[in-house]
Amino acid sequence: ASYAGLNIPGILDQPREASSENPAPALVWVHGGPGGQSRKGYSAAIQHLVNHGYAVYQINNRGSSGYGKTFYHLDDLKHGEADLGDVVASREFLASFDWIDGDRVGIIGGSYGGYMVAAALAFEPEAFEIGINIFGVTNWLRTLKSIPPWWGAFRDSLYAELGDPATDTDRLT
């Protein structure tokens, strides 16, 4: 998929029975993080969906790890903007395959991925037919304020990427 001139990597799993004569519904899977990464390998949840006839596209939108520091920092202090554009563009990418039913594309994710589900449904309501938010963050201000002091390095990393709740309240609400 690509958005705003940037190629966005991902992993696409095709159900065995999907074909141009029998197009499959599809889900865009957004990993947790932010800064996480979807990788090739076994995932019970994804395998379950594919076994039940869903195409699953695991997007590594801008801000994902594993593609260099520049790519990783492209969404710093801008979550729900271009990263959301990446996710919406992946729907168009999926609809381009004749073995995918372009009228039945949803979005699924947990943690940061769940936040992206909520953002897609709120800010791009026509993009997806369904959204599945698995324990997604819907209140970044509360989440960032609740990080315990013994998670200092992780807290600092999240503040750099998402914002400091003491100084970036307007953007985080």
Where are these predicted regions, by residue range?
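Glycine/threonine-rich flexible loop motifs
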Residues: 35-41, 66
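N-terminal cap/lid segment of alpha/beta-hydrolase-fold proteins
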Residues: 1-21
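Short beta-strand segments enriched for Tyr within beta-sheet-rich domains
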Residues: 24, 54, 128-129
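Active-site-proximal cap/loop segments of hydrolase catalytic domains
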Residues: 61-173
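Short amphipathic alpha-helix adjacent to the substrate-entry channel of hydrolases
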Residues: 40-60, 72
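Short beta-strand element of the alpha/beta-hydrolase
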Residues: 14, 21-32
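Serine-hydrolase catalytic-loop signature spanning alpha/beta hydrolases and amidase-signature enzymes
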Residues: 32-36, 56
